[in-house]
Amino acid sequence: MKVNDLVTVKTDGKTRREGTILAVETFQEGIMYLVALEDYPAGIWFFNEVDSKDGTFVELKTLSEKE
């Protein structure tokens, strides 16, 4: 994923929230994404772990979700 991609993020609520990637930082353990959400237009950092599906918080929004 890259800057300006439309994504959904897993937060403490049950519904994934839609946002836009503002920045990407790569680390050995995974990738951090700064994502602008409606409530947080300046962005919030989310970390996707490399080796864990449970540690995946940011996902690219699919075409079916865009409809």
Swiss-Prot record:
Source domain of life: Bacteria
Alphabetical list of InterPro entries matching this protein: Dextransucrase_DSRB
Pfam families, per the entry: DSRB
HAMAP family: DsrB
Family recorded in the similarity comment: Belongs to the DsrB family.
Protein known as: Protein DsrB
Protein species of origin: Pectobacterium atrosepticum (strain SCRI 1043 / ATCC BAA-672)
